[in-house]
């Protein structure tokens, strides 16, 4: 039932503008439809939405006697408790704002009601009369932002982008968009993968792998692996309980940690994360945008764990061992890349290779680092710590720790510690353990262990400019492809670049690949812009 909000809630919610664009108007009406349980929504824009907006749904509808209250300020059926907001809309402001800025027509009928109602509203004038209507609600907005000289094409583009975003978070919604009477978006509610095709395009959608983890905290989504990334998280979309929201720093932090072995530092995946969280696991800012959230530490930890589980399921990464106790060595999963054949080197620093329908460019130093890093990691898991031939005394400028990820230690007075055991690969180098131990005091936990192993792998790795015979290059490539995470070096830099044949076809403006045998002769070149070249 629609009812006015009490004064104390009005004060908390009366912040910010509701309508700044046609996109804002469509978003508010679409959220009303979703909150009403709609399974099908039709959106029409005329003049980019500046002349007329139509949003029609098959939701539960509004009873005739409640229609006038629906366009009053701070009137809503959705908000009971600010701590337990379960709907997309809750402020009770959108229809009132539309009534003040444009002419508003609402035709609605609940399924159990005989006959519907038609409400006409503009400013302070409100007219209600019975009228035939199918089950659901149809809202028309006429003359929004009249006289402001807005660009209809820009407004329509904003709405199209908005609807594609909502499909990522409501992939079973049947949604159509008509621009000037022509169908621009037709989505039958075919699921998340098809929604991703609409939002990202078919080529990128094929490179997304699924995420799914259930429970009180749940995650569904799609993400790219190491082959695709961006230097900004502008194509990474988040929803909490169906609400599209901006990425809070806590989520970005969890994603960066989960991808730390897969992507270069400062890079982000492409995809969508749909989180379902219980009350208390997140906090929503109560402004007009309704898109800023803060997640609890528990929710952030759940997200990171869910991502890492998905990566292991895709053979993309494995977790580093906990410092103590060391887990047993497990058989490695299948290689993350298909077999490659090296056929050239460039400037004695890069290997050029091909595999199936792709070309790979491999940084030989970063590749050797990754190989050595995983060898050290495997030996640490398999061999653990072994007693040193004799204890090594180390003097420190700080209080010694109680434990170390790479050494067995015991205190030996103020600022002094004895190293009793170490990984076997350090035993032949008696001068290294004290230096490595001091280095191990920087950082914490797994990141500290990773940094130490990365440093140990970097020292003996092949350097740029070191010539390799073809057989040596092939051996290096084979060893890299046997790694569990061949995409980045231990420091987070890329190891290889990956170009699929379809990428080359698109860049060169061809119609098909060499294997397709569809064109007996090359077609003549065509003029291209920089963007299309």
Swiss-Prot record:
Coiled coil: none annotated. The keyword Hydrolase does not apply. Residues 515-533 have a biased composition (Basic and acidic residues). GO terms for cellular component: mismatch repair complex. Residues 510-533 are annotated as: Disordered. Transmembrane segments: none annotated. InterPro entries: DNA_mismatch_repair_MutL, DNA_mismatch_S5_2-like, HATPase_C_sf, MutL/Mlh/PMS, MutL/Mlh/Pms-like, MutL_C, MutL_C_dimsub, MutL_C_regsub. Pfam families: DNA_mis_repair, HATPase_c_3, MutL_C. Keywords: DNA damage, DNA repair. One of its GO terms (biological process) is mismatch repair. The keyword DNA-binding does not apply. GO terms for molecular function: ATP binding; ATP hydrolysis activity; ATP-dependent DNA damage sensor activity; mismatched DNA binding. This protein is involved in the repair of mismatches in DNA. It is required for dam-dependent methyl-directed DNA mismatch repair. May act as a 'molecular matchmaker', a protein that promotes the formation of a stable complex between two or more DNA-binding proteins in an ATP-dependent manner without itself being part of a final effector complex. Belongs to the DNA mismatch repair MutL/HexB family. This is DNA mismatch repair protein MutL. It comes from Thermus aquaticus.
């Amino acid at each position: 039932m629609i009812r006015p909000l009490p004064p104390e809630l009005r004060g908390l919610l009366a912040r910010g503008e509701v309508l700044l664009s046609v996109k804002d108007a469509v978003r508010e009406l679409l959220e009303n439809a979703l909150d009403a349980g709609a399974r099908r929504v039709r959106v029409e824009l005329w003049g980019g939405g500046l002349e007329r907006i139509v949003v029609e749904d098959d939701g539960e509808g509004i009873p005739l006697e409640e229609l006038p209250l629906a366009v009053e300020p701070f009137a809503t059926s959705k908000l009971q408790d600010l701590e337990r907001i379960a709907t997309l809309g809750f402020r009770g402001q959108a229809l009132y704002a539309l009534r003040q800025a444009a002419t508003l027509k609402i035709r609605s009928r609940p399924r159990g009601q005989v006959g519907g109602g038609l409400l006409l509203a503009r400013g302070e004038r409100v007219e209600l009369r019975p009228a035939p209507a199918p089950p659901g609600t149809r809202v028309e907005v006429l003359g929004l932002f009249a006289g402001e000289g807005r660009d209809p094409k820009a407004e329509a583009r904003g709405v199209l982008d908005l609807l594609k975003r909502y499909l990522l978070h409501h992939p079973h919604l049947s949604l159509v968009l008509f621009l000037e009477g022509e169908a621009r978006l037709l989505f039958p509610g075919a699921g998340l993968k098809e929604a991703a095709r609409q939002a990202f395009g078919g080529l990128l959608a094929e490179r997304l792998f699924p995420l799914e983890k259930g429970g009180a905290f749940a995650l569904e989504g799609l993400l790219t692996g190491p082959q695709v990334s961006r230097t900004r998280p502008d194509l990474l979309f988040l929803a909490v309980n169906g609400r599209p929201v901006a990425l809070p720093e806590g989520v970005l932090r969890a994603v960066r940690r989960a991808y730390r072995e897969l992507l270069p530092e400062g890079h982000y995946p492409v995809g969508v994360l749909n989180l379902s969280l219980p009350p208390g696991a997140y906090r929503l800012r109560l402004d007009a945008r309704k898109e800023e959230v803060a997640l609890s530490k528990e929710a952030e930890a759940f997200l990171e764990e869910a991502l890492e589980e998905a990566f292991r399921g895709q053979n993309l990464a494995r977790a580093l061992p906990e410092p103590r106790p060391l887990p047993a060595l497990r058989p490695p999963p299948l290689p993350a890349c298909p077999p490659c054949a090296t056929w050239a080197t460039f400037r004695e620093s890069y290997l050029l290779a091909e595999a199936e329908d792709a070309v790979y460019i491999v940084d030989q130093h970063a590749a050797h680092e990754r190989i050595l890093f995983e060898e050290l990691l495997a030996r640490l898991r398999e061999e653990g710590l072994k007693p040193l031939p004799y204890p090594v005394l180390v003097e420190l400028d700080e209080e010694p720790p109680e434990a170390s990820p790479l050494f067995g230690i015991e205190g030996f007075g103020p600022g002094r510690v004895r190293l009793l055991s170490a990984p076997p690969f350090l035993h032949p180098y008696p001068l290294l353990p004290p230096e490595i131990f001091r280095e191990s005091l920087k950082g914490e936990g797994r990141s500290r262990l990773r940094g130490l192993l990365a440093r140990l792998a970097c020292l003996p790795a092949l350097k740029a400019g070191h010539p390799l015979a073809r057989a040596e290059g092939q051996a290096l490539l084979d060893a890299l492809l046997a790694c569990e995470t061949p995409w980045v070096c231990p420091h987070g830099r890329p190891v290889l670049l990956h170009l699929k044949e379809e990428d080359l076809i698109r860049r060169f403006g061809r119609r098909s690949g060499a294997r397709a045998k569809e064109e007996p002769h090359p077609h003549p070149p065509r003029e291209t812009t920089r963007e299309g070249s």
